[in-house]
Amino acid sequence: MSLSKLKAPKGANRERTRVGRGQGSGLGKTAGRGGKGQKARSGNMHFEGFEGGQMPLQRRLPKFGFKNVFRREFEEVKVGDLDGLSGVVDPAALKGAGLVRGNRDGVVVLGGGELKSAVTVKVHRVTAGARAAIEKAGGTVELIPAPVTMYEKAKAARKAQAKK
């Protein structure tokens, strides 16, 4: 048995059926589309949610919520993931260990799992449960300021301009 001798199971690769090629084929004349009507025509399909001219459900329901474009997104690390690390654990160490990618607005430690070794954790946010677990293991937590976003820089510049 080798890869070059493998074959697809019988019936797996079917030839494309050619429709509209005479009545003897079983798919002649209307080509499996039934009689007349919108669905029998080319370019027939109306858009998803169309209800025949009646106001569609997605337009009958009220709008709600919004997406905050200035929202800060933090990468999440669980306390249990810190167990293999030692010494000072900061975003650079977490990135080196492959626990975060480093492409968000900071790192937050969540309280899932157990920590057996004492570590100094320097991150942007820590939940109460995570802080308790780290301190129970004999470690310490230091909060570092989150990186300043482009929006915050622009806001500060506008504020400084208004004072002048």
Swiss-Prot record:
Region entry Disordered, spans: 1-52
UniProt KW keywords: Ribonucleoprotein, Ribosomal protein, RNA-binding, rRNA-binding
Family designation: Belongs to the universal ribosomal protein uL15 family.
Domain of life: Bacteria
GO BP annotations listed: translation
Description of how the protein assembles with itself and partners: Part of the 50S ribosomal subunit.
PANTHER family: 50S RIBOSOMAL PROTEIN L15, LARGE RIBOSOMAL SUBUNIT PROTEIN UL15M
Function (record text): Binds to the 23S rRNA.
UniProt GO cellular component terms: cytosolic large ribosomal subunit
Protein name: Large ribosomal subunit protein uL15
HAMAP family for the chain: Ribosomal_uL15
Alphabetical list of SUPFAM superfamilies matching this protein: Ribosomal proteins L15p and L18e
UniProt GO molecular function: rRNA binding; structural constituent of ribosome
Pfam families: Ribosomal_L27A (PF00828)
Regions of compositional bias (Gly residues) in chain numbering: 21-37
